[in-house]
């Protein structure tokens, strides 16, 4: 990953989350990262993000298929499909994520899905 390539960074993010490499994943984010998901509490800071991936994420055994990545300045928009398990049950849904970069790190992340909550 290069600090100046948002597309490479977001693609690396999905690889790391699918491989459950959360230490490397969290390193892609700014220390004061803010992660927002409609209907869910906001996650603020690297430690809260790490805790979310280690303990609070309801999705498991899954993979992301990326359909599109669009970069405009310091923002990368990603559209894709997630397939995996939610609370032990098979699940598949579409998602759109927006990653805002500052100094080569993901500073803000917004996730939207075609489900009520994940």
Regions found by a protein language model. Name each.
Residues 39, 43-44, 107:
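Domain-scale activation on soluble regions of proteins
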Residues 19-25, 47-56:
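N-terminal short leaders/motifs
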Residues 29, 41, 51-53:
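A generic structured-segment signal
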Residues 2-5, 36, 50-118:
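A beta-strand edge to alpha-helix "cap/lid" segment located at domain peripheries
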Residues 1-23, 27-28:
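Short, low-complexity N-terminal intrinsically disordered segments enriched in polar/charged residues
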Residues 14, 41, 68-70:
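Structured beta->alpha junctions
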Residues 10, 37-40:
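Conserved short-loop catalytic and cofactor-binding motifs
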